[in-house]
């Protein structure tokens, strides 16, 4: 009986508490597009990563893949006898014969490490390039969604970005307050050796990591689009949307990486077939279903822990964009706590 009374008392106490633990929005937000890498908004699903720059006229979405590296497997026994040079190197160092030590260390150095490679950049170019107002770019930490809002020629535009782990893709949803107001061109580029093709409403970029084509990890990036109203046409190297009310851009990628100890070409994974399968699956997706799966998966991890450093919901979120909060850190206690929570 005493235990039951204690349980009821605890429940009543919790119900009577004010909602001071409610968190302010867990968002980073800015009033201008990103001009540099450090200003972009990162998204990722554990394999694919994306950086959102958010320029309304030419939006760059810089993408990478966890498995895209330079180099090839190395024989683990290649430097098996390297340890015998260590005493000689130490002897040279103690004798301050640094030139000799430097030459001897070549016997134990082995091959250079592989380099992590950039993948591609997806450009969303607005055909109606003109002045924009009411700009806002944000990243929601509690949903792993990025947004860009702006106004052009009396029309409000919104772009929503996500990197889905369940569906292994990156998606961008374009919408506008006025029907048939979206006019954009989609292109793919890469700093690596590559070629771009279009077919059946699909944009494809294939290439390989730094090095010889027959020795390097290969990759295939595909963009597909679903849209409402308007038209979707293709040039040799781009997809063009005209008079569209709403569109979803799907990006998928696969590489020939097949394990750290397997050659990426001779024993590589079937990256072309896998990318084509991913693209076909993406084209059958409804964006709302994709979003629900993404949120359920992400929040399963993010919601395990929450942090509150102050009572009440801070007004600092609405008062100042994140870069201004950083510059004013140390001058407003309430805002400092909110920034630290972020």
Which residues does each predicted region cover?
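Aromatic-residue-lined binding/catalytic grooves and analogous aromatic/hydrophobic interfacial grooves
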Residues: 22-342
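Bacterial Sec-dependent N-terminal signal peptides
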Residues: 1-23
